[in-house]
Amino acid sequence: PAVNIIASPWSAPAWMKKTGHLCQGGHLRFGEWTGNGFDPMHDSFEGCYARYFVKYVEEMGKLGIPIWGVTVQNEPSNAPKWPAMMWTLKQQAEFAHNFLRPAMNEKFPEMRIFINDDSTHNLMWPVRDIVTPDEASSVDGLTVHTYEGPYSNFFNASRSYPQWMFGMTERRCMINETPEDAAHIMSGIIGNWLVRNGENFIV
């Protein structure tokens, strides 16, 4: 197909979260067991959640909708009134390396995995200081929204792991903006940088 689809979750099921609720953020039950055994890939909450991603890709494929890539979390610093879940960049990288990539490799080894998928304020520190080279090897790229934080954070992030793909996955016209303002950011500032650096997607 001419369009590559990236899937991005808002929240794990409530029973997998420390809060027990879908909405207003909350964290995955990191380091805990579901009670069915002690196999990390099948009995930890992280392993169980990773297999939800695989099942989603399978079911979408049955509907004729091929999933090209996934992000670990949509807006992981956001805790709105609707379903959401909080992650640090480090937690995303660890989950991708230890659970999501191994789970995907069983059935979808070509699946692209992206981290961040949030505004650039999450990228104030060098990504290499947060994500280890081993973790980076399980990640295909980093995606951003352009609501908060300087755009230079995004540009600088590409220096840590230049082999990654970089893209923008969300932007809307803010209350104090015109459509032309938003277009300038998407196609002008971010879009031009992506093209100059050989990147190929704005979603």
Model-predicted regions and their roles:
Residues 2-4, 63-69, 108-112, 137-140, ...:
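Loop/turn elements at helix/coil->beta-strand transitions in domains of secreted/extracellular proteins
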